[in-house]
């Protein structure tokens, strides 16, 4: 219903099932959908099924029925603030409209809406100034920052589907993943594939090569070569890859293609289908990527291997806990239980104690039941 948290270079989001981890990541995707090319407020709300689906089930009349996002950003010596409040339009259309849009730079107000123009023509409130190039010139760094948000949650079954004919642009689940790779400038793509190939040789037994080839219909495919008893490596395409190999390829691509200028990479449970040895080094791999591209990384996880990385501190772990009035978000470092780390407990041990359901006997009863 209401969450407030700081984001540093990295943030690891943990919590039980249905605590809101995906929804928390979606805050950043929502702002990216507004600021991004071809997006906007109406697009961002519609993509999520309407304003009623975006607001918390526990919200009731919280914030007078408004959806409110309030973000503070540091850019060198400058501090920006962007606040957006959205409500449903009164009347038949019930379109999402801007209730408030505020921008400040170093506490100096740059924009406040509604203004006189909005009051004279209320249709203007169906769009934010954030999404309009002609209107966001004075706070373009905010729009650029949100536009660089990238989300990764590759679904191998979607990539393998041979019947796919229509793909969604920038689909985080992978329907256009190989198309995106193929559309990259050849020299850049080949350089990135070489970097990925070296990583995959270390992580996947027998892996030898990775390339993109077009079939007779012009559709691009990932082609991997695997060493075997023959002199030439055997070739497989994405339909033959394991879930883990596909997700690892996607994860490497997401990391390598991030721009050098600051941005945000959102990863949802990146450990899925990956070997525990690979999962264990993911924080180090991501830390290396952050050093080379100056990005913030926010990921949700259930993996103790990730949380127990020696480089992770309690102020990088955001804990979501379910209450009778919605989920509560707190940094692990702010909780008294963090002192258990000084006694030798690992971060995953402390987190498990805080988020584990009180009673799981219902699961055993369900497994034992017979009709």
Where are these regions (language model features)?
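Conserved ABC ATPase signature
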Residues: 198-201, 208-256, 264-277
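Phosphate-binding glycine-rich loops of NTP-binding sites
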Residues: 9-49, 248-254, 284-285, 300, ...
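C-terminal lobe/lid and adjacent interdomain/linker elements of RecA-like ASCE P-loop ATPase modules
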Residues: 281-371
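Conserved P-loop NTP-binding catalytic core
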Residues: 26-94
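Electropositive, glycine-dotted interaction segments
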Residues: 74-214
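ABC ATPase nucleotide-binding domain "signature" loop
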Residues: 15-18, 269-276, 306
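Pre-Walker A adenine-sensing motif
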Residues: 1-4
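Pre-Walker A (Motif I) flank of P-loop NTPase domains
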Residues: 8-11, 261-263
């Amino acid at each position: 219903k209401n969450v407030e948290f700081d984001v540093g270079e990295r943030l690891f989001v943990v919590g039980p099932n249905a605590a809101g981890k995906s929804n928390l990541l979606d805050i950043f995707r929502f702002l990216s959908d507004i600021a991004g090319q071809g997006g906007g407020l109406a697009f961002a709300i519609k993509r999520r099924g309407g304003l009623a689906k975006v607001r918390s089930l526990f919200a009731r009349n919280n914030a007078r029925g408004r959806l409110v996002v309030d973000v503070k950003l540091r850019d060198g010596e400058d501090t920006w603030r962007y606040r957006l409040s959205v409500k449903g339009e009164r009347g038949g259309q019930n379109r999402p409209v801007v209730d408030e849009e505020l921008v400040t730079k170093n506490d100096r107000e740059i924009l406040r809406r509604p203004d006189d123009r909005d009051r004279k023509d209320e249709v203007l409130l169906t769009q934010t100034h954030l999404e309009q190039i002609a209107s966001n010139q004075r706070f373009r760094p905010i729009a650029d920052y949100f536009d660089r948000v990238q989300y990764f949650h590759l679904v191998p079954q979607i990539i393998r589907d041979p019947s796919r004919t229509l793909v969604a642009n920038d689909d985080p689940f992978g329907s256009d993943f190989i198309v995106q790779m193929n559309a990259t400038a050849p020299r850049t793509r080949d350089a990135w594939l070489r970097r990925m190939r070296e990583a995959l040789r270390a992580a996947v037994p027998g892996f030898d090569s990775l390339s993109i080839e077009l079939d007779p219909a012009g559709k691009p495919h990932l082609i991997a070569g695997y060493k075997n008893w023959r002199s030439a490596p055997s070739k497989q395409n994405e339909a033959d890859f394991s879930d883990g190999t596909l997700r690892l390829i996607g994860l490497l691509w997401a990391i390598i293609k991030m721009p050098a200028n600051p941005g945000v990479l959102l990863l949802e449970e990146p450990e899925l289908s990956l070997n525990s040895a690979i999962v264990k080094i993911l924080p180090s791999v991501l830390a290396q990527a952050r050093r080379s591209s100056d990005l913030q990384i926010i990921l949700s996880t259930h993996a103790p291997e990730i949380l127990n990385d020696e480089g992770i501190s309690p102020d990088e772990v955001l804990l979501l806990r379910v209450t009778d009035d919605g989920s509560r978000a707190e940094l692990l470092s702010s909780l008294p239980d963090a002192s258990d780390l000084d006694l030798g407990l690992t971060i995953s041990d402390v987190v498990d104690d805080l988020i584990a359901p009180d009673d799981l006997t219902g699961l055993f009863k369900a497994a034992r039941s017979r009709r």
